[in-house]
Amino acid sequence: MSAQKPGLHPRNRHHSRYDLATLCQVNPELRQFLTLTPAGEQSVDFANPLAVKALNKALLAHFYAVANWDIPDGFLCPPVPGRADYIHHLADLLAEASGTIPANASILDIGVGANCIYPLIGVHEYGWRFTGSETSSQALSSAQAIISANPGLNRAIRLRRQKESGAIFNGIIHKNEQYDATLCNPPFHDSAAAARAGSERKRRNLGLNKDDALNFGGQQQELWCEGGEVNFIKKMIEESKGFAKQVMWFTSLVSRGENLPPLYRALTDVGAVKVVKKEMAQGQKQSRFIAWTFMNDEQRRRFVNRQR
Protein backbone atom coordinates (compact mmCIF):
# COMPACT_ATOMS: atom_id res chain seq x y z
CA MET A 1 0.00 0.00 0.00
CA SER A 2 1.29 3.48 -0.87
CA ALA A 3 2.27 5.68 2.04
CA GLN A 4 0.61 9.09 2.01
CA LYS A 5 2.59 12.30 2.22
CA PRO A 6 1.32 14.15 5.30
CA GLY A 7 -0.28 17.52 4.95
CA LEU A 8 -0.79 17.88 1.19
CA HIS A 9 -4.01 19.49 -0.05
CA PRO A 10 -6.80 16.92 -0.69
CA ARG A 11 -6.83 17.71 -4.43
CA ASN A 12 -3.05 17.47 -4.77
CA ARG A 13 -2.15 14.66 -7.21
CA HIS A 14 0.98 13.69 -5.26
CA HIS A 15 -0.37 12.10 -2.06
CA SER A 16 1.08 8.68 -2.85
CA ARG A 17 4.75 7.88 -3.26
CA TYR A 18 6.08 8.35 -6.74
CA ASP A 19 5.24 5.46 -9.07
CA LEU A 20 8.79 5.31 -10.42
CA ALA A 21 8.10 2.52 -12.92
CA THR A 22 5.41 4.63 -14.61
CA LEU A 23 7.47 7.82 -14.41
CA CYS A 24 10.43 6.04 -16.03
CA GLN A 25 8.16 4.99 -18.90
CA VAL A 26 7.09 8.63 -19.31
CA ASN A 27 10.69 9.87 -19.16
CA PRO A 28 13.25 7.07 -19.71
CA GLU A 29 16.08 9.49 -18.72
CA LEU A 30 14.92 9.10 -15.12
CA ARG A 31 15.95 5.43 -14.97
CA GLN A 32 19.68 6.21 -14.73
CA PHE A 33 19.08 8.28 -11.56
CA LEU A 34 17.27 5.63 -9.53
CA THR A 35 18.92 4.50 -6.29
CA LEU A 36 18.12 2.06 -3.51
CA THR A 37 17.39 3.31 0.00
CA PRO A 38 18.90 1.48 3.03
CA ALA A 39 15.47 -0.18 3.36
CA GLY A 40 15.85 -1.57 -0.17
CA GLU A 41 13.23 0.68 -1.78
CA GLN A 42 13.73 2.44 -5.10
CA SER A 43 14.17 6.19 -4.88
CA VAL A 44 15.61 9.09 -6.86
CA ASP A 45 19.03 10.61 -6.20
CA PHE A 46 17.66 13.96 -4.97
CA ALA A 47 21.18 15.33 -4.45
CA ASN A 48 21.77 15.26 -8.21
CA PRO A 49 20.22 18.24 -10.05
CA LEU A 50 19.99 16.20 -13.28
CA ALA A 51 17.97 13.57 -11.40
CA VAL A 52 15.59 16.19 -9.98
CA LYS A 53 15.18 17.73 -13.43
CA ALA A 54 14.43 14.29 -14.96
CA LEU A 55 11.87 13.62 -12.20
CA ASN A 56 10.19 16.98 -12.81
CA LYS A 57 10.01 16.32 -16.56
CA ALA A 58 8.26 13.01 -15.84
CA LEU A 59 5.86 14.49 -13.24
CA LEU A 60 4.87 17.42 -15.45
CA ALA A 61 4.31 15.16 -18.46
CA HIS A 62 2.41 12.46 -16.55
CA PHE A 63 0.21 14.59 -14.28
CA TYR A 64 -0.06 17.96 -16.05
CA ALA A 65 0.15 17.13 -19.79
CA VAL A 66 3.33 19.19 -20.21
CA ALA A 67 5.17 17.00 -22.72
CA ASN A 68 8.11 19.36 -23.23
CA TRP A 69 9.76 20.96 -20.20
CA ASP A 70 13.36 21.97 -19.55
CA ILE A 71 15.29 24.69 -17.71
CA PRO A 72 18.83 26.03 -18.22
CA ASP A 73 21.58 24.92 -15.83
CA GLY A 74 21.82 27.01 -12.67
CA PHE A 75 18.11 27.83 -12.33
CA LEU A 76 15.87 26.58 -9.53
CA CYS A 77 14.33 23.16 -10.09
CA PRO A 78 11.12 23.34 -8.04
CA PRO A 79 9.53 20.46 -6.09
CA VAL A 80 6.27 19.90 -7.97
CA PRO A 81 4.03 18.68 -5.07
CA GLY A 82 4.68 21.79 -2.96
CA ARG A 83 4.10 24.13 -5.90
CA ALA A 84 0.82 22.34 -6.68
CA ASP A 85 -0.28 22.83 -3.07
CA TYR A 86 -0.07 26.63 -3.38
CA ILE A 87 -2.28 26.48 -6.51
CA HIS A 88 -4.90 24.27 -4.81
CA HIS A 89 -5.07 26.41 -1.66
CA LEU A 90 -5.32 29.50 -3.86
CA ALA A 91 -8.28 27.85 -5.64
CA ASP A 92 -10.02 27.41 -2.26
CA LEU A 93 -9.42 31.07 -1.47
CA LEU A 94 -10.94 32.15 -4.80
CA ALA A 95 -13.94 29.87 -4.19
CA GLU A 96 -14.96 31.62 -0.96
CA ALA A 97 -16.56 34.56 -2.85
CA SER A 98 -19.03 32.46 -4.85
CA GLY A 99 -18.89 28.93 -3.42
CA THR A 100 -17.22 27.48 -6.51
CA ILE A 101 -13.69 27.62 -7.93
CA PRO A 102 -13.77 30.08 -10.84
CA ALA A 103 -12.93 28.31 -14.11
CA ASN A 104 -11.78 31.43 -15.93
CA ALA A 105 -9.74 33.13 -13.22
CA SER A 106 -6.96 35.47 -14.27
CA ILE A 107 -3.79 35.05 -12.19
CA LEU A 108 -0.58 37.09 -12.04
CA ASP A 109 2.58 35.15 -11.13
CA ILE A 110 5.27 37.52 -9.82
CA GLY A 111 8.64 36.00 -10.74
CA VAL A 112 7.39 33.23 -13.02
CA GLY A 113 10.95 31.85 -13.28
CA ALA A 114 12.65 29.79 -15.95
CA ASN A 115 10.52 26.80 -14.87
CA CYS A 116 7.07 28.47 -15.34
CA ILE A 117 5.80 25.99 -12.75
CA TYR A 118 2.76 27.75 -11.27
CA PRO A 119 1.12 28.60 -14.62
CA LEU A 120 1.71 25.05 -15.91
CA ILE A 121 -0.08 23.54 -12.91
CA GLY A 122 -2.83 26.18 -12.72
CA VAL A 123 -3.73 25.94 -16.41
CA HIS A 124 -4.02 22.15 -16.26
CA GLU A 125 -5.85 21.87 -12.93
CA TYR A 126 -8.31 24.76 -13.23
CA GLY A 127 -8.16 26.20 -16.76
CA TRP A 128 -6.96 29.54 -15.39
CA ARG A 129 -5.23 32.19 -17.49
CA PHE A 130 -1.84 33.45 -16.33
CA THR A 131 0.37 36.47 -16.76
CA GLY A 132 3.94 35.80 -15.59
CA SER A 133 6.36 38.61 -14.74
CA GLU A 134 10.13 38.20 -14.64
CA THR A 135 13.21 40.44 -14.29
CA SER A 136 15.64 37.99 -15.91
CA SER A 137 15.63 37.85 -19.71
CA GLN A 138 17.19 34.35 -19.60
CA ALA A 139 14.42 33.08 -17.29
CA LEU A 140 11.80 34.71 -19.51
CA SER A 141 13.26 33.04 -22.62
CA SER A 142 13.22 29.65 -20.89
CA ALA A 143 9.60 30.07 -19.73
CA GLN A 144 8.57 31.18 -23.23
CA ALA A 145 10.30 28.14 -24.76
CA ILE A 146 8.24 25.85 -22.47
CA ILE A 147 5.01 27.64 -23.42
CA SER A 148 5.80 27.51 -27.15
CA ALA A 149 6.75 23.81 -27.02
CA ASN A 150 3.40 22.70 -25.57
CA PRO A 151 0.23 23.10 -27.68
CA GLY A 152 -2.46 25.28 -26.13
CA LEU A 153 -0.29 27.06 -23.57
CA ASN A 154 0.26 30.13 -25.76
CA ARG A 155 -3.43 30.95 -25.37
CA ALA A 156 -3.36 30.53 -21.59
CA ILE A 157 -0.03 32.03 -20.47
CA ARG A 158 1.55 35.37 -21.40
CA LEU A 159 4.85 36.72 -20.10
CA ARG A 160 6.00 40.24 -19.29
CA ARG A 161 9.48 41.54 -18.53
CA GLN A 162 9.76 43.69 -15.39
CA LYS A 163 12.03 46.48 -16.58
CA GLU A 164 11.69 48.75 -13.53
CA SER A 165 14.39 48.01 -10.98
CA GLY A 166 12.80 47.31 -7.60
CA ALA A 167 9.22 47.41 -8.91
CA ILE A 168 6.84 44.48 -8.45
CA PHE A 169 3.34 45.33 -9.74
CA ASN A 170 4.20 48.71 -11.23
CA GLY A 171 4.87 48.35 -14.95
CA ILE A 172 3.32 44.86 -15.02
CA ILE A 173 -0.38 45.41 -14.21
CA HIS A 174 -1.76 47.54 -17.03
CA LYS A 175 -4.33 50.28 -16.54
CA ASN A 176 -7.55 48.41 -17.40
CA GLU A 177 -6.51 44.88 -16.35
CA GLN A 178 -8.10 42.89 -13.56
CA TYR A 179 -6.73 39.83 -11.77
CA ASP A 180 -8.51 37.43 -9.44
CA ALA A 181 -5.23 36.83 -7.60
CA THR A 182 -1.50 37.33 -7.63
CA LEU A 183 0.95 34.71 -6.39
CA CYS A 184 4.65 34.87 -5.60
CA ASN A 185 7.52 32.75 -4.32
CA PRO A 186 9.75 35.60 -3.11
CA PRO A 187 13.57 35.64 -2.83
CA PHE A 188 14.41 34.08 0.52
CA HIS A 189 17.82 35.44 1.57
CA ASP A 190 19.06 38.99 2.18
CA SER A 191 22.52 38.58 0.60
CA ALA A 192 24.56 36.36 -1.71
CA ALA A 193 26.56 35.18 1.33
CA ALA A 194 23.38 34.10 3.14
CA ALA A 195 22.21 32.27 0.00
CA ARG A 196 25.56 30.43 -0.19
CA ALA A 197 25.35 29.52 3.50
CA GLY A 198 21.84 28.14 2.95
CA SER A 199 23.06 25.95 0.11
CA GLU A 200 25.99 24.81 2.26
CA ARG A 201 23.58 23.76 5.05
CA LYS A 202 21.51 21.72 2.60
CA ARG A 203 24.68 20.15 1.23
CA ARG A 204 25.79 19.08 4.72
CA ASN A 205 22.32 17.73 5.53
CA LEU A 206 22.55 15.49 2.46
CA GLY A 207 26.08 14.40 3.37
CA LEU A 208 27.58 15.92 0.23
CA ASN A 209 31.00 17.46 -0.19
CA LYS A 210 31.65 20.84 -1.81
CA ASP A 211 32.33 19.39 -5.23
CA ASP A 212 29.07 17.47 -5.44
CA ALA A 213 26.49 18.72 -7.90
CA LEU A 214 23.53 20.33 -6.21
CA ASN A 215 19.79 20.49 -6.60
CA PHE A 216 20.01 23.91 -4.98
CA GLY A 217 20.63 25.95 -8.09
CA GLY A 218 19.24 29.40 -8.39
CA GLN A 219 20.09 32.72 -9.93
CA GLN A 220 20.61 35.80 -7.77
CA GLN A 221 17.07 37.09 -8.34
CA GLU A 222 15.62 33.70 -7.36
CA LEU A 223 17.54 33.36 -4.09
CA TRP A 224 18.19 36.76 -2.54
CA CYS A 225 17.35 40.45 -2.58
CA GLU A 226 18.23 43.48 -0.45
CA GLY A 227 16.51 43.05 2.93
CA GLY A 228 15.47 39.47 2.15
CA GLU A 229 11.96 38.06 2.04
CA VAL A 230 10.39 40.48 4.55
CA ASN A 231 11.50 43.57 2.64
CA PHE A 232 10.42 42.09 -0.68
CA ILE A 233 6.91 41.26 0.59
CA LYS A 234 6.66 44.65 2.35
CA LYS A 235 7.40 46.32 -0.98
CA MET A 236 4.71 44.15 -2.56
CA ILE A 237 2.25 45.20 0.15
CA GLU A 238 3.03 48.89 -0.39
CA GLU A 239 2.58 48.63 -4.16
CA SER A 240 -0.60 46.53 -3.84
CA LYS A 241 -2.52 49.51 -2.44
CA GLY A 242 -2.27 51.16 -5.87
CA PHE A 243 -4.03 48.18 -7.49
CA ALA A 244 -6.70 47.67 -4.80
CA LYS A 245 -9.58 47.77 -7.30
CA GLN A 246 -7.85 45.73 -10.03
CA VAL A 247 -6.84 42.68 -7.96
CA MET A 248 -9.12 40.69 -5.65
CA TRP A 249 -6.47 38.77 -3.67
CA PHE A 250 -2.76 39.48 -3.38
CA THR A 251 -0.79 36.47 -2.08
CA SER A 252 2.79 35.49 -1.31
CA LEU A 253 4.60 32.52 0.16
CA VAL A 254 6.28 33.28 3.51
CA SER A 255 9.13 30.89 4.30
CA ARG A 256 9.36 31.46 8.06
CA GLY A 257 6.61 31.96 10.61
CA GLU A 258 8.70 34.59 12.43
CA ASN A 259 8.52 36.78 9.32
CA LEU A 260 4.74 37.18 9.68
CA PRO A 261 4.44 39.89 12.44
CA PRO A 262 6.18 42.70 10.46
CA LEU A 263 4.10 41.75 7.41
CA TYR A 264 0.86 41.90 9.40
CA ARG A 265 1.87 45.37 10.64
CA ALA A 266 2.54 46.49 7.06
CA LEU A 267 -0.89 45.18 6.00
CA THR A 268 -2.56 47.14 8.81
CA ASP A 269 -0.66 50.26 7.70
CA VAL A 270 -1.96 50.04 4.10
CA GLY A 271 -5.53 49.37 5.22
CA ALA A 272 -6.02 45.79 4.01
CA VAL A 273 -9.69 44.85 4.56
CA LYS A 274 -9.05 41.13 5.12
CA VAL A 275 -5.88 39.10 5.70
CA VAL A 276 -5.73 35.30 5.50
CA LYS A 277 -2.93 32.86 6.31
CA LYS A 278 -2.95 29.41 4.70
CA GLU A 279 -0.69 26.80 6.32
CA MET A 280 0.76 24.07 4.10
CA ALA A 281 2.89 21.01 4.78
CA GLN A 282 4.79 18.58 2.59
CA GLY A 283 6.38 15.83 4.63
CA GLN A 284 8.50 17.55 7.29
CA LYS A 285 8.54 20.86 5.41
CA GLN A 286 6.14 23.49 6.74
CA SER A 287 5.22 26.49 4.63
CA ARG A 288 2.47 29.05 4.34
CA PHE A 289 1.18 31.87 2.25
CA ILE A 290 -0.51 35.08 3.26
CA ALA A 291 -3.30 36.69 1.28
CA TRP A 292 -4.76 40.16 1.57
CA THR A 293 -7.53 42.09 -0.12
CA PHE A 294 -8.82 45.66 -0.16
CA MET A 295 -12.34 44.48 -1.08
CA ASN A 296 -15.12 43.57 1.35
CA ASP A 297 -17.24 40.41 0.94
CA GLU A 298 -19.81 42.06 -1.35
CA GLN A 299 -17.16 43.71 -3.52
CA ARG A 300 -15.38 40.36 -3.93
CA ARG A 301 -18.64 38.67 -4.95
CA ARG A 302 -19.22 41.35 -7.58
CA PHE A 303 -15.61 41.09 -8.76
CA VAL A 304 -15.87 37.32 -9.30
CA ASN A 305 -19.11 37.75 -11.27
CA ARG A 306 -17.80 40.59 -13.46
CA GLN A 307 -17.90 40.54 -17.25
CA ARG A 308 -14.63 39.12 -18.60
From Swiss-Prot:
It is an enzyme of class 2 (transferase). One of its GO terms (biological process) is rRNA base methylation. The keyword Transferase applies. Its EC number is 2.1.1.181. One of its GO terms (cellular component) is cytoplasm. The keyword Metal-binding does not apply. It is found in: Cytoplasm. One of its GO terms (molecular function) is 23S rRNA (adenine(1618)-N(6))-methyltransferase activity. It catalyses: adenosine(1618) in 23S rRNA + S-adenosyl-L-methionine = N(6)-methyladenosine(1618) in 23S rRNA + S-adenosyl-L-homocysteine + H(+). Keywords: Cytoplasm, Methyltransferase, rRNA processing, S-adenosyl-L-methionine, Transferase. SUPFAM superfamilies: S-adenosyl-L-methionine-dependent methyltransferases. Belongs to the methyltransferase superfamily. METTL16/RlmF family. Specifically methylates the adenine in position 1618 of 23S rRNA. This is Ribosomal RNA large subunit methyltransferase F. It comes from Shigella flexneri. The gene is rlmF.
